[in-house]
C-alpha cells in the first residue's frame, strides 16, 4: 500500500504498533483504493501515550522558552523543506488537490510552529505595585493536553494544536480523525527529528472510544477539539467531569453578505472560495450567501459561468482545482442535502450531481431562491453546495444572518467601509472578514461563538488557552495581625 506508515501510533519518540486494535482502512477518495491500514489504539497504547506525556512535561516546562522555540523553529524549517512530499501525502489522505495542499495545509502548519516559537519567549507575567508590597504573576503551562483533530485539514489542525501547546511548555497526546490519520504521524516524526524530547507529542489512532478514554483521564488538564457540534457536546461534557480546560472549534453555517455596491468579481470569487475550496469541506465556509436583490441575477449568472469552469479530476494532477469529498459516506450525505434542497423549492443554478466516477466527486452546486426555513439554509452540509438568499436592507441582512445557532464566521462585501464595520460589529460570529473570505493567518485568533465553539486557536489569544496564571503576593514588611 503506497502510503503505509511505519506503525499506527507514535508514542514516546518512536513508532508503536499493536495489531490487536480494530483495523482502520485509509481510503484514497479519488479512486476508492486502500492506501494504508492502521489499527485503533488499545488501552495499553493509550496508557503508554498518556504516561509518557505526563512524565516528559515537567522537564520541558522547566526549559528556557528560547530553547523550546529553537526546536519548534527547526520543525517548521523541516516541514517547509519537505512541503512537496508532505503535500502529496495530504492529498492521498484527504483527496484535496495538490493545487491546494501545496499552499494551504502543511504551509499553514509550518507558519503556526514558527509563530508560536517566536511568541514563546515573549510570554511574561505582570507586576502589580501595592505600595510597599507588590504582586507578580506567572503564566504556567497547563500540563498534559489532548488534541482531537478533524478530517478536513488534518495536518494543519495537528500543527495548530501542537504549536501553542508545546511552545508554552505543555505535552500533547493527539488523536487525528480515523478518516485521515496519516499526517499527524509525520508531524510527530519531524518534531523528534527537530529535537523535541520523546513523549511530548504522541499520536494515537482511533474512533470515538479512544477519544473518550483520552478526554476523561485524570492526568489530562486540557482538551482541544476540532469537529462537529454533536462531537463537541460529547467531548465538552466529558471534559467538564474533570473540570478541564477546553477549546472547541466546531461547525458553522456562516453568512456572506454581498451589498449592491460590492466589487462583483471579488464577491463571487470569495463566495466560490467559501463554498468550493476543499470541495466545500471547511467549517468556516460562507454557505449562506446573502445577495442584495438588485444584483442577484447578475451575481448568479456570473457565478454559474465561473463555477462551470472549475476543473475537477485527479487530485494528483497539478492543474485540477477541485477534488472529491473525503469519503463515500460524505458523498451520500451531500447528495441527500442536494435532493432535499430541490424538494424544498430551491432553484438549481448549476451542478447538483455526482461527477467523475470512480471517486467521491460532487459538482460545484448553487441553489438560488433559498429561504431561511429551508434545510439548506439551516444545516451544515460540508460539501460544495452554496445557498444564495436575497435581501433588501442592511437591517434585514444582519437579522437574518444572526438567525442561527452557529456563530463561527461571517463576511461582508461592500465598497462602503463605514457600513462594513457597522455590519461586522453586529454580526454574531467569532471570525469576520471584510471584502475577503476564509483567510486564516496564524497571527490572528480563530474561533466561534454560540454553538460554533469556545476558546481561540492561533494568535496571541491562544496563550490564554494553553497557560494558567499564578498570582504571587510579596509582603515587604512585618505582618500586622489582630491577634
Curated annotation (Swiss-Prot):
Cofactor descriptive note: Binds 2 potassium ions per subunit.
Pathway: Amine and polyamine biosynthesis; betaine biosynthesis via choline pathway; betaine from betaine aldehyde: step 1/1
Gene3D superfamilies: Aldehyde Dehydrogenase, Chain A, domain 1 (3.40.605.10), Aldehyde Dehydrogenase, Chain A, domain 2 (3.40.309.10)
Binding positions (K(+) 1): 27, 93, 179
Annotated catalysed reactions: betaine aldehyde + NAD(+) + H2O = glycine betaine + NADH + 2 H(+)
Cofactors: K(+)
UniProt xrefs under Pfam families: Aldedh (PF00171)
Residues the record lists as Cysteine sulfenic acid (-SOH) modifications: 283
Annotated coiled-coil segments of the chain: none
UniProt GO MF annotations: betaine-aldehyde dehydrogenase (NAD+) activity; metal ion binding
GO biological process: glycine betaine biosynthetic process from choline
Keywords for the protein's UniProt record, in alphabetical order: Metal-binding, NAD, NADP, Oxidation, Oxidoreductase, Potassium
Residues annotated for K(+) 2 binding in this entry: 243, 450, 453
Subunit structure: Dimer of dimers.
Family as reported in the entry's similarity comment: Belongs to the aldehyde dehydrogenase family.
Protein role: Involved in the biosynthesis of the osmoprotectant glycine betaine. Catalyzes the irreversible oxidation of betaine aldehyde to the corresponding acid.
Protein name listed in UniProt: Betaine aldehyde dehydrogenase
Gene from which this protein is expressed: betB
Amino acid at each position: 500500500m503506497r502510503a503505509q506508515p511505519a506503525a499506527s501510533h507514535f508514542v514516546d519518540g518512536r513508532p508503536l504498533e499493536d495489531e490487536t486494535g480494530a483495523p482502520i482502512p485509509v481510503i484514497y477518495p479519488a479512486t476508492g483504493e486502500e492506501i494504508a491500514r492502521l489499527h485503533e489504539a488499545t488501552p495499553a497504547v493509550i496508557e503508554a501515550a498518556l504516561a509518557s506525556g505526563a512524565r516528559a512535561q515537567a522537564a520541558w516546562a522547566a526549559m528556557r522558552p528560547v530553547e523550546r522555540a529553537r526546536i519548534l523553529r527547526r520543525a517548521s524549517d523541516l516541514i517547509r523543506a519537505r512541503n512537496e512530499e508532505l503535500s502529496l501525502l495530504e492529498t492521498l489522505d484527504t483527496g484535496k488537490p495538490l493545487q491546494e495542499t501545496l499552499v494551504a495545509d502543511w504551509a499553514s502548519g509550518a507558519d503556526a510552529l514558527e509563530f508560536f516559537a517566536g511568541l514563546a519567549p515573549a510570554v511574561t507575567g505582570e507586576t502589580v505595585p501595592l505600595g510597599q508590597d507588590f504582586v507578580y504573576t506567572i503564566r504556567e503551562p497547563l500540563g498534559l493536553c489532548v488534541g482531537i483533530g478533524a478530517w478536513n485539514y488534518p495536518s494543519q489542525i495537528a500543527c495548530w494544536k501542537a504549536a501553542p501547546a508545546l511552545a508554552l511548555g505543555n505535552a500533547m497526546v493527539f488523536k487525528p480523525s480515523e478518516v485521515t490519520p496519516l499526517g499527524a504521524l509525520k508531524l510527530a516524526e519531524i518534531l523528534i527529528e527537530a529535537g523535541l524530547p520523546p513523549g511530548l507529542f504522541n499520536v494515537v489512532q482511533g474512533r470515538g472510544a479512544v477519544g473518550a478514554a483520552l478526554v476523561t483521564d485524570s492526568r489530562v488538564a486540557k482538551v482541544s477539539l476540532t469537529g462537529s457540534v454533536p462531537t463537541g457536546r460529547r467531548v465538552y461534557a466529558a471534559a467538564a467531569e474533570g473540570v478541564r480546560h477546553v477549546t472547541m472549534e466546531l461547525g458553522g453555517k456562516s453568512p456572506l453578505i454581498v451589498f449592491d455596491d460590492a466589487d462583483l468579481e471579488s464577491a463571487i470569487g470569495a463566495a466560490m472560495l467559501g463554498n468550493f475550496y476543499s470541495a466545500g469541506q471547511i467549517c468556516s465556509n460562507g454557505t449562506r450567501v446573502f445577495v442584495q436583490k438588485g444584483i442577484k441575477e447578475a451575481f448568479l449568472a456570473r457565478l454559474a459561468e465561473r463555477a462551470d469552469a472549475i476543473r475537477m479530476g485527479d487530485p494528483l494532477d497539478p492543474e485540477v482545482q477541485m477534488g472529491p469529498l473525503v469519503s463515500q459516506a460524505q458523498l451520500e450525505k451531500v447528495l441527500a442535502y442536494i435532493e432535499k434542497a430541490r424538494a424544498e423549492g430551491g432553484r438549481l443554478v448549476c451542478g447538483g450531481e455526482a461527477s467523475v466516477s470512480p471517486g467521491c466527486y460532487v459538482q460545484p452546486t448553487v441553489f438560488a431562491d433559498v429561504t431561511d426555513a429551508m434545510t439548506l439554509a439551516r444545516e451544515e452540509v460540508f460539501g460544495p453546495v452554496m445557498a444564495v438568499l436575497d435581501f433588501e436592507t442592511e437591517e434585514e441582512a444582519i437579522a437574518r444572518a444572526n438567525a442561527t445557532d452557529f456563530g463561527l464566521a461571517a463576511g461582508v462585501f461592500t465598497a462602503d467601509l463605514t457600513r462594513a464595520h457597522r455590519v461586522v460589529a453586529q454580526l454574531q460570529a467569532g471570525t469576520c472578514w471584510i471584502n475577503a473570505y476564509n483567510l486564516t493567518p496564524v497571527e490572528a485568533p480563530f474561533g466561534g461563538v454560540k454553538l460554533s465553539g469556545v476558546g481561540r486557536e492561533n494568535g496571541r489569544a491562544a496563550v490564554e488557552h494553553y497557560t494558567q496564571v499564578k498570582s504571587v503576593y510579596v509582603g515587604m514588611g512585618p505582618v500586622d495581625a489582630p491577634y
